């Protein structure tokens, strides 16, 4: 069903200073925002945490952009708070490795809004599923370094992404990697306020979240970076859990059973009593990556510290000797180019697509 035309309808707003409504003059209906009519939707390229994303052309400039329609279907009183958070955060952020919010445009009837973002030709999840040969270690280092630079910028600006995963990492044809989808991101301060633990896609979720902590710091992003680095190195997800219990068990199988000795405060986490953790005394990272250098293993160990306070920061990782030894990270411009999967109409995600990356 087509949206009503603005030119044919009056828009009336409730006045908060006195009773009644007033009619918005036609020349002020869009405020300082452009209309979505000025963009030609080319194809749907995906779905973020809180909205559908299209590849589109700005008819004024001919620029190709990503147009993210903000979900309003469950809202009766305006823009969802999650979308307001994303807009507010993205307007503050300007970094080469963070997706850029160019502007906000409005739908025909002012009941829908769209975020105009910088367009990236690829996302890493699609690449991992479709590329004929895996990334080389030099290419993996190039990708992860860019993710870390973007994260260091976020964390210095007191922002936690809270949903890092390969599908939220985009890449341009020039090899520039950008972190996207800030629908779950939060600004934090001191002292850290409680937040819901039900964030971060399961495979990338830190153990403290799985065990119910409401104290979230930048360390949850760093655990996810460890999962991403391991996934790129192994060419498949490291911890593909099917439930929260299974996810915890996979972590214990890989890293050993946590205890108060290595993770002070572990026994007081809200959900510890609900799980019976297997007794597993060994860290098996070296067995998982027998070919990885000592520096690479040290970096993974640092990222997978159980104790969030001891876990590597983005700055720590950027100083890691792993990125300074051979094979050295390749330059972004030398990253391979790939067919533009995002330029095709996106098919709905299937379990078959996920299992493809899970096979040994």
Swiss-Prot record:
InterPro entries: CDK, Kinase-like_dom_sf, Prot_kinase_dom, Protein_kinase_ATP_BS, Ser/Thr_kinase_AS, STKc_CDK10. It comes from the Eukaryota. Residues 334-360 are annotated as: Disordered. It catalyses: L-seryl-[protein] + ATP = O-phospho-L-seryl-[protein] + ADP + H(+); L-threonyl-[protein] + ATP = O-phospho-L-threonyl-[protein] + ADP + H(+). It is found in: Cytoplasm, Cytoskeleton, Cilium basal body. Residues 39-323 form the Protein kinase domain. Keywords: ATP-binding, Cell projection, Cilium biogenesis/degradation, Cytoplasm, Cytoskeleton, Kinase, Nucleotide-binding, Phosphoprotein, Serine/threonine-protein kinase, Transferase. GO terms for cellular component: ciliary basal body; cyclin-dependent protein kinase holoenzyme complex; cytoplasm; nucleus. Its main location: cytoplasm. Disulfide bonds: none annotated. It is an enzyme of class 2 (transferase). The modification Phosphothreonine is found at residue 196. ATP binds at residues 45-53, 68. GO terms for molecular function: ATP binding; cyclin-dependent protein serine/threonine kinase activity; protein serine kinase activity; protein serine/threonine kinase activity. Transmembrane segments: none annotated. Its EC number is 2.7.11.22. Gene3D superfamilies: Phosphorylase Kinase, domain 1, Transferase(Phosphotransferase) domain 1. The active site is at residue 163. Belongs to the protein kinase superfamily. CMGC Ser/Thr protein kinase family. CDC2/CDKX subfamily. It is linked to Al Kaissi syndrome: An autosomal recessive developmental disorder characterized by growth retardation, spine malformation, facial dysmorphisms, and developmental delay. Cyclin-dependent kinase that phosphorylates the transcription factor ETS2 (in vitro) and positively controls its proteasomal degradation (in cells). Involved in the regulation of actin cytoskeleton organization through the phosphorylation of actin dynamics regulators such as PKN2. Is a negative regulator of ciliogenesis through phosphorylation of PKN2 and promotion of RhoA signaling. Heterodimer with CCNQ, the interaction is required for kinase activity. Interacts with ETS2. Interacts with PRK2. This is Cyclin-dependent kinase 10. It comes from Homo sapiens. The gene is CDK10.
